[in-house]
């Protein structure tokens, strides 16, 4: 029988880091962000990720620890027995930050050599203000830089986290320079993804499996994960098979109006 035990995040966690918390507060992400760490005892093969997630979210202790934001603004449990978890395995193999080099190497650059983010004509897409070329890259399909990053690159967990911090919450205070976005994305990524050196090759490689939780089913249908629809709603479950820890990173977007 599997035992799941919620544990506290250590003081060294990125979510307890003063810099990260300050940036997430500035971008209006911290107030509706939660991270739950859970130890598990049963061995799961890497192909049994869906089984692990189903067992995880069915566990009573996990259901007590993992809470979601309701429409009224209160936090609460999922509200029913879990019958199925629909999740997508994400790419999380990156061990370097050179993915972001393209932002300065393209012509014209999205990010200038001094780190400044280029500005653009103001627009509004999906409820988000677009006033710089970084947000335009993320939100505007017809942007001249839309093809700069491939679909596979945009599916990488590191890029997903980067998008989340760039877009922020409803009261986000934008950055003029790219560095805070990149640095915070890196720290969150390292929080979720465990890396080890391969003894055979000497190369550093990731060992974690990270899943995007699409929906959680109950007896009578989907259980409500978020108070409203938004691309800034996310729930990631990062499985560290070495230490047998799952970290669930959850955020719910609440519109200002």
UniProtKB/Swiss-Prot annotation:
InterPro entries: CFAP300 (IPR029416). Keywords: Cell projection, Cilium, Cytoplasm, Cytoskeleton, Flagellum. Disulfide bonds: none annotated. It comes from the Eukaryota. Its main location: cytoplasm. It is found in: Cytoplasm; Cytoplasm, Cytoskeleton, Flagellum axoneme. PANTHER family: CILIA- AND FLAGELLA-ASSOCIATED PROTEIN 300. Cilium- and flagellum-specific protein that plays a role in axonemal structure organization and motility. Plays a role in outer and inner dynein arm assembly. This is Cilia- and flagella-associated protein 300. It comes from Chlamydomonas reinhardtii (Chlamydomonas smithii).
């Amino acid at each position: 029988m599997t035992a799941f035990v919620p544990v506290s995040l250590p003081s060294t966690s990125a979510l307890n880091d003063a810099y990260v918390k300050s940036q997430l507060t500035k971008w209006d992400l911290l107030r509706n962000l939660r991270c739950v760490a859970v130890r598990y005892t049963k061995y799961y093969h890497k192909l049994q990720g869906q089984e692990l997630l189903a067992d995880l979210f069915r566990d009573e202790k996990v259901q007590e620890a993992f809470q979601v934001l309701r429409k009224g603004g209160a936090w609460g449990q999922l509200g029913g027995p879990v019958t199925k978890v629909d999740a997508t395995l994400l790419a999380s193999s990156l061990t370097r930050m050179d993915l972001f080099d393209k932002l300065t190497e393209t012509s014209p650059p999205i990010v200038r050599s001094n780190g400044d983010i280029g500005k653009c004509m103001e627009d509004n897409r999906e409820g988000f203000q677009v006033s710089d070329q970084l947000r335009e890259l993320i939100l505007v399909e017809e942007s001249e830089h839309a093809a700069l990053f491939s679909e596979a690159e945009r599916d990488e967990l590191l890029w997903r986290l980067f998008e989340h911090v760039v877009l922020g919450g409803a009261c986000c205070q934008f950055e003029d320079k790219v560095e805070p976005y990149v640095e915070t994305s890196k720290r969150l990524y390292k929080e979720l993804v465990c890396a080890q050196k391969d003894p055979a090759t000497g190369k550093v490689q990731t060992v974690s499996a990270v899943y995007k939780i699409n929906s959680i089913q109950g007896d009578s249908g989907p259980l409500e994960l978020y108070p409203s629809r938004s691309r800034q709603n996310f729930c990631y479950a990062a499985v560290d098979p070495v230490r047998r820890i799952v970290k669930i990173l959850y955020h719910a977007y609440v519109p200002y109006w």
